[in-house]
Amino acid sequence: PFSLRAVELLKRVGVHAWKIASGEANNVEIMKSISETNNEVFLSTGMSSINEIDLSVKKIKDFGLPLTILQCTSIYPTPPEKIGLNMINYLRNRYECNVGLSDHSGKLYTGLAAASIGIEVLEVHVTFSKEMFGPDVSSSISIDELKLLVEGVRFIENILEHEVDKDAIAEELKPMRKIFRKSVVYLKDMKEGTIIKRQDICFKKPGTGVKPEDLNNVLG
């Protein structure tokens, strides 16, 4: 909301969370009014300095409201060098709360990159067509891109939730290892008693025989 009147309207509507835009980040009256609902607050940091974020966070926490801080840069569209994913973990560590990204890049890559770092919230602008007229069309993704973004974020979340044990995977892949690994093989039939030299052998699939790392046990 951008005014106390808007806050009162949204209270009557029954919203379950509040977004404080960076332009309202120092608006104590709005913060006080929304605090009466005890709903979660999403604080955008698009135009705020660290000192200003400190003050906003303190005020919101003083009101006892659940808080998620959104890394954001108020440039439309935001170029990649200004997106600031480095701030995700910085904000999380500094304020010890949930952190998300409010993205104005107009690209789905940004949200995927943020998801790979680990975020609780991803906010994007969406347009029905990039040919439409409007102040944030250039900062928006299409409906089709939104679908891909959601699928990608869920895929990445699944990756991050499951750590891999390399030894366990190697054991699981034993049948494949036998197919793709190689064994020590003689290049030609050898007579009994022949002294085997390096030039007499090669490595070939499958890996069901003497392992290449055991080559020295065969030579001589």
Protein language model annotation of sequence segments:
Residues 1-220:
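Catalytic cores and adjacent flexible loops of soluble metabolic enzymes
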